[in-house]
Amino acid sequence: MQDDLKNAPIGFFDSGLGGLSVLRKALEMMPNENYIYYGDSKHAPYGEKTPQEIRSLSFNAIEFLIKKGAKAIVIACNTATSAAAHDLREYYKDIPIIGIEPALKPAIKLHETGSVIVMATKATLTQEKFKNLMDKYGEHREVIPLPCPGLVEFIEAGNLEGEEVKNFLREKLNPYMDREISSIVLGCTHYPFVKDVIQDIVGEKVDIIDGSSGTIRELKRRLEENNMQSELKKKGDLDIFNSLEDNKILELSKKLIEIK
């Protein structure tokens, strides 16, 4: 493989800022790669759109990243993975495309008892992909799908810990607090940015997990399998783009990348 392709960037896209939570994990696990991030905040949230709309927007995002020279693509959006991953892989056969799905399997494996709440967008929870996960892993445990329309908008506005977002999350989670909850799965890549608020509401005994680590492990595996890993000896570069073309959203993107 040509060195220039090996050192080409990995493209990440999301319906907005959420995929930055997955990119953070990539920067931690694979620091010597170059990265391009495309957030489609102009059309956020994807979770309330039709599958056809989500597919169309996902194709546009990948075209943008490929034109920027991406050697591999991470769909850093649960909703876009559910609605579009299959079609994207069929069309772009020559480029590794890695998606993300709710981390239901590890959540169930963590504990032998207790219910698992899956917080996600309506679109993710109604897609075939999630139904298959439920059939596979939800047979012997109570899995509670919890759609959270409106939460993405708080995060896109940079509201990660204000009273408004705290009240929103309390309202969503309080009806389940009388049950034995073992884990909460964050099934939307925006949601890790409010993980601390969720943890405060449900208490320290409840594990909160997302699919970022598994996605980046799969990305790493695919790059190694195709001999496409970067040969850079230094920390790679990161370029961030957003369909809003607004300095405020780019500043917020940089801030979110730095949050630990």
From Swiss-Prot:
Enzyme class (EC, first level): isomerase
Tell me one Pfam family matched here. Asp_Glu_race
> Gene3D superfamilies given for it?
3.40.50.1860
Residues of the active site: C77 (proton donor/acceptor), C188 (proton donor/acceptor)
Q: Which GO terms describe its biological process?
A: cell wall organization; peptidoglycan biosynthetic process; regulation of cell shape
- What SUPFAM superfamilies does the entry give? Aspartate/glutamate racemase
User: What pathway does the UniProt record associate with this protein?
Assistant: Cell wall biogenesis; peptidoglycan biosynthesis
Write down the EC number: 5.1.1.3
Q: Which InterPro entries match?
A: Asp/Glu/hydantoin_racemase, Asp/Glu_race, Asp/Glu_racemase_AS_1, Asp/Glu_racemase_AS_2, Glu_race
Q: Which reaction does it catalyse?
A: L-glutamate = D-glutamate
Q: Which domain of life is it from?
A: Bacteria
Q: Which UniProt keywords apply?
A: Cell shape, Cell wall biogenesis/degradation, Isomerase, Peptidoglycan synthesis
Q: Where does substrate bind?
A: D14, S15, Y46, G47, N78, T79, T189, H190
Which molecular function term from Gene Ontology is one that the record holds? glutamate racemase activity
Q: Does the keyword Cell wall biogenesis/degradation apply?
A: yes
Q: What does this protein do?
A: Provides the (R)-glutamate required for cell wall biosynthesis.
Question: Family per UniProt?
Answer: Belongs to the aspartate/glutamate racemases family.
Which NCBIfam families does the record associate with it?
glut_race
Its recorded name reads Glutamate racemase
Protein species of origin: Clostridium perfringens (strain SM101 / Type A)
Traced from the root, the source organism's taxonomic lineage reads:
Bacteria, Bacillati, Bacillota, Clostridia, Eubacteriales
